[in-house]
Structure formats: C-alpha cells, structure tokens
Amino acid sequence: MNVMYAWFHIYRPIGPDPCPELALTPEQQVEVRKFVVEMRSRKPIVIIDAYHDGEGNALCPAATGFTHHISPWGDIEPCPIIQFANESIHDERPLRQVFNESEFLRDFRETAAQHTRGCIVLERADLLHDLAERHGARDTTARNAAYQELENLDLRPSQYNPGHEVREKNLVYRWAKKFWFNDYGAYTKHFDASNWVDSREAPIEQSNVPELHQIEQ
C-alpha cells in the first residue's frame, strides 16, 4: 500500500470533553506495547512509538528533553497535550536558546522526571497545574480553559508499569533507541520512586462499547 511508517499513540483523556472511560487500563497498554514490538520484528514498515526505550523502560519524551511542541500560534509548549507556554517562536532569541534557557520548560522536565517515568498529565495533573501557575504560564488553548480542565482530570494509569517492561525484539530498533531515543540521563538524575503515586489501581469505568477486534498479525 506504499505505507512507509505508522505512529502509535495511547489516548490521553484531556480537554473540554476528555472521555476518561476511553483510557486504556495498564493491561491494555501492555498489550499495545507487545503488539508494536512484535510488528517491528515481523513487518517491513517503520513503527514509531513515544513511550519506551529499547529495553522497554517507560519514558516521556518531553521530560527527557528529547522533544517539545510548537502550537499553531507559535507557542512553545512542553508537549502537544500540555497547552501552556511562556515562550514563543516569535521571541527574538534563537529557538535553541529558548529551549535551553526557558525556566518553565526546565522546571517541567525536572518535575515530571522526579515523580514518574510515565505521563504527568495522567498521573499527576495536580503537579502540572501548580507548575504552570507558579511560572505564570499562558493558557495557549483557544477556549482559555486549560487550568480548569486540569483541575477536573481524574487519576489515570500511564505507560509507567514497573515489572511489565517489554524489550524490543528487533535489534535495529534496540540499537537505534540506545543512541537516539532514551532518557538521556533524566531519570537517573531526577527520578525518586518514593515520589511516584501508583495510579495503576485507580478505578476506570470503561465505556460500554463492543469488544475490540484483535488486529491480525
């Protein structure tokens, strides 16, 4: 079909109508990870994910400093689903300098890495709210309701699921991630397991939808 790559994301319930019942359980997230790893070893297509290193350890690309997000209006945000910013591409400083000197982005990376190897939006929206408020970060949404939406979020499990790591089978992916997609020392430097709030047992009322169909392998 001339498809060169596919990108797998796990749903993050956020926004004006977050639909938390659609959030995946820890078990479902492990199955998604297993599927991606298996397909990488069997199919002639590049499959991209954003949640694990080559050994299967969970990570957040924004917390590691691997990537941040630029909104349609030019706001420099920590992540596509974290719509707060103090800087813009329209600032006079070069983009590289903005990324390196932003106190908001640096504090975000450290705060996220200190508390979880997963998604701070799902696990600790309260910390994110306090962080943005402390820095006076702008709400970059058109609806101007991001702060309130964070307050309304329920605790949800994310990709950090200790004891259920799934290592890459494909040596090419494992090698590539070793050099180009890892935690860059962020968790070694900052993560403290005693700070982590285990959200895996959080009650999840999933929607009454037909049973999901298994993707043919």
Feature annotation, model-predicted:
Residues 22-23, 28-31, 57-65, 73, ...:
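Short alpha-helical interface elements
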Residues 1-59, 63, 72, 77, ...:
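Radical SAM enzyme [4Fe-4S]-AdoMet core and its adjacent flexible, acidic
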Residues 81-217:
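Flexible mid-to-C-terminal extensions adjoining Fe-S/redox cofactors in radical SAM and related proteins
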